[in-house]
UniProtKB/Swiss-Prot annotation:
Annotated InterPro entries: Ribosomal_bL35 (IPR001706), Ribosomal_bL35-like (IPR021137), Ribosomal_bL35_CS (IPR018265), Ribosomal_bL35_sf (IPR037229)
GO CC, alphabetical: cytosolic large ribosomal subunit
GO molecular function: structural constituent of ribosome
Keywords: Ribonucleoprotein, Ribosomal protein
Protein name: Large ribosomal subunit protein bL35
Record carries keyword Heme: no
Family recorded in the similarity comment: Belongs to the bacterial ribosomal protein bL35 family.
SUPFAM superfamilies: L35p-like
Lineage: Bacteria, Bacillati, Cyanobacteriota, Cyanophyceae, Oscillatoriophycideae
GO BP annotations, alphabetical order: translation
Length: 67
């Protein structure tokens, strides 16, 4: 059986926790058009990582077979 291919775009966007059970992603809406967004919104609510929802986690794992 041939090796499974990893989707490279997904590999750059998702990381796994140390235990390998959960998948993290970067929060959206922080690339451009930032001048009208408040500091509280940009730095507190949009900073850091968040978990991928349970509904999407199965699709992400299919894209990244060797997580």
């Amino acid at each position: 059986m041939p090796k499974l291919k990893t989707r490279k775009a997904a590999a750059k966007r998702f990381r796994v926790t140390g235990s390998g059970k959960k998948i993290f992603r970067r929060k959206a809406f922080k690339n451009h058009l930032l001048q009208h967004k408040s500091s509280e919104r940009k730095f507190r609510r949009l900073s850091g990582l968040s978990l991928v929802s349970e509904q999407d986690e199965a699709n992400v794992r299919l894209m990244l077979p060797y997580l």
